A protein has these predicted regions:
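Cross-family detector of peptidyl-prolyl cis-trans isomerase
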Residues: 19-140
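Sec-dependent bacterial lipoprotein signal peptides
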Residues: 1-19
Length: 140
């Protein structure tokens, strides 16, 4: 019976040590943040060979403090009358996620079925913003 309090004390000490904060994430990822922000600013001003912006800055109506950069690979004027999904819509997406330096980090092509079916609102904010902006048939 005397072993139970000692066991509980050891568990408490392990819990305290395990929960100790080691480093502030803001400081830990400072270099990554600065590189990422520099890339975004550079891309906002990037132009193609005809002088047109390469990326479109998209700010959602529901939060003006965030935005995404979208690069369309198709002629969006051809899909102008097509439907856009709502946050409650279910969409089929084929995607390849890449870091700013072109390093791939995720892809639907790595799955058995390359189509990723999801409800728009179940994704990260960047995807929600982009998907709500896209029309059926768009490629970004």
């Amino acid at each position: 019976m005397k072993k139970l309090p000692i066991f509980l004390l050891i568990c408490l000490l392990i819990g305290i040590v395990a929960c100790k904060e080691t480093e502030d994430y803001w400081t830990q990822y400072e270099q990554w943040r600065e590189t990422n922000e520099s890339w975004f600013i550079e891309q906002l001003g990037a132009k193609d060979e005809k002088g047109n912006p390469i990326y479109t800055k998209v700010v959602p109506s529901w939060d003006h403090s965030i935005y995404v950069l979208m690069k369309y690979y198709n002629d969006t004027s051809l899909n102008r009358d097509a439907q856009s999904p709502y946050q409650t819509s279910t969409v089929d997406v084929i995607y390849k996620g890449m870091l700013y330096d072109g390093t791939p980090f995720d892809s639907s092509y790595l799955r058995t079925d390359s189509i990723y079916r999801t409800q728009v609102k179940q994704n990260i904010k960047g995807w929600i913003i982009a998907l709500e902006q896209m029309k059926v048939g768009d490629s970004c």
